[in-house]
Amino acid sequence: MTSELDIFVGNTTLIDEDVYRLWLDGYSVTDAVALRVRSGILEQTGATAAVLQSDTMDHYRTFHMLERLLHAPPKLLHQLIFQIPPSRQALLIERYYAFDEAFVREVLGKKLSKGTKKDLDDISTKTGITLKSCRRQFDNFKRVFKVVEEMRGSLVDNIQQHFLLSDRLARDYAAIVFFANNRFETGKKKLQYLSFGDFAFCAELMIQNWTLGAVDSQMDDMDMDLDKEFLQDLKELKVLVADKDLLDLHKSLVCTALRGKLGVFSEMEANFKNLSRGLVNVAAKLTHNKDVRDLFVDLVEKFVEPCRSDHWPLSDVRFFLNQYSASVHSLDGFRHQALWDRYMGTLRGCLLRLYHD
């Protein structure tokens, strides 16, 4: 009589999250071992220093072999060499593509080229992030940009599909790609108070409203490129400040609506025309690439700084922008309402986000 025996062999790849973090942060094996010793792991586990060294080296070898798969995350899902549960695969991918706020602020809006990569030594010194980690993050930005730059469809969806990132991280990468493509200036001294989150918020609004994809979901590069026709049309808004009667009527409508509601009413009334000229002239200049790049510099100079110097609270800024935008619909001589709404709807959201200390 013969009996059959089924044998199952498991070789699940073990991933130590703490060691993975040390590897991602760019620490050498020696430094990683020292940090693990400092954490008290030898006392907790009863292991020897030699075992800890061997364990760390084994993990580093595994991560090094996984790295080429992490460059194209769908490959990690479909390979058979490493037996890694789906939840662990998602963690590996998400953390590999995560980035440091201090690092992204240094490269946001810059061309993702060799020229910028040469600056990584200085960025590493300035931020305290290891050079190896800076390189990984920069290469990730560049890799995502290269994959999605020629694709049709939603930028966020394309990033999620090809890199399997969470919705939040995919949206952050969409902002990075959008800023790199349009080369927005973010490094000037007067912009240093702004966080990556501030810029990412504005990028999302612009992608939704000012790109080719905002008006035609079948357009090539729809979420990467600003709608040039829209930018050209914005010159039509100049009539709001060039026509004295329209400017006076606009001011009158806003002041009538806000009298008694703003703590800074007298400051607003005195500065209305300067603020309006600033906002409208920003729009009219967006036909030039340099002025597109300087958008955030102009918004801070023309609106944020004047209001801040007069000590406007955020609530008053919100009241003003809402009424300033809405009152244009009551100007009988103005015929570009849809264009105005497309411009100010996005600009209002951006300005409210940019208005803080």
Curated annotation (Swiss-Prot):
It comes from the Eukaryota. It is a peripheral membrane protein. One of its GO terms (molecular function) is fibroblast growth factor binding. Keywords: Acetylation, Membrane, Nucleus. Transmembrane segments: none annotated. Binds to internalized FGF1; this interaction is increased in the presence of CSNKB, suggesting a possible cooperative interaction between CSNKB and FIBP in binding to FGF1. It is found in: Nucleus; Endomembrane system. This is Acidic fibroblast growth factor intracellular-binding protein. The keyword Electron transport does not apply. May be involved in mitogenic function of FGF1. May mediate with IER2 FGF-signaling in the establishment of laterality in the embryo. It comes from Chlorocebus aethiops (Green monkey). The modification N-acetylthreonine is found at residue 2. GO terms for biological process: platelet aggregation. GO terms for cellular component: endomembrane system; membrane; nucleus. It holds the Pfam family FIBP. The keyword Isomerase does not apply.
